[in-house]
Amino acid sequence: MKFDILIAGEINPDLILSGDVLPEFGQVEKLVETASLTIGSSSAIFACGAARLGLKVAFIGVCGDDVFGRFMLDEMSKRNVDVNNVIVRSNGQTGLSVILNNRSDRAILTHSGLIAELRSSDISDNLLRQSKHLHVASYFLQTKLQPDLPNLFDRAHVLGLTTSLDTNYDPSEQWFGFDELLSGTDVFLPNQVEALSITKASDVESAARRLATKAKLVAVKLGANGSLACSQNSVSKSTSISVKVVDTVGAGDSFDAGFLYGYLNNWELEKTLRLACVCGALSTQQAGGTSGQPILKDAMKYVS
């Protein structure tokens, strides 16, 4: 098999502005401490994290033939992500997320660009056959992929792949429309807010149990409080590790990378959860979503 994971996702860079300030309208200029252009997008950050752990990773998405698109493809390639299947369009513009990070929280403004343009029909059976697993993130942003995504997961299963989904946040805050998709999902990876919003449950464990009646395995990210995983037969929990947090951008995507590393290597669930929590925590020690992502050897120092 050529690839461990194929990611169908979005390709936008992040412009991260850090400082203890809030923007103010009225042509008021505020000074930030640092500014950096980094790999952005949940799918791309996940891809880099998985490759950093040693998985063979391929990516398919849509970007423009422009500065931001070329930046993303170059930076992902440097991190051993195969981008040969990315669709580059001359008649569209790669988007951008501007993130204002004041250390305790962050605000995000996104120009979606070509995020919504990937379709299920762009993902051939031949490409699927080269992979063991198919991962999709940013479900609510990939609007042209949404309608046929259940069929794409079905195609993947017929060809022997397992599937995973991280919806990420729903900008419309409607949180519906993917029950059929969850039923065809092997691993569902929401965070606490997403799990509670989707299920309308009053607590995380109840939310995870409800989701596990559809997806085969659910792992809920709880930030500094660790994580909780639920299948139809069991519930497992893991703590995180204490680190000096610089930037939480992409921590959930690094968690996903660690979780799917363990899942694809048939680890026990408790060990898989622990690696995921460690990967998420370690990634927050540097600015941007990918700079702090660990190699497997470093992450395993915290995994028994």
Could you say what each language-model-derived stretch is?
Residues 1-13, 75-88, 102-237:
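Ribokinase/PfkB-type carbohydrate-kinase core domain
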Residues 43-47, 69, 149, 192, ...:
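A general structural signal for well-ordered alpha-helical segments in protein cores
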Residues 53, 92-94, 223:
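Short, basic and Ser/Thr-rich N-terminal targeting/leader segments
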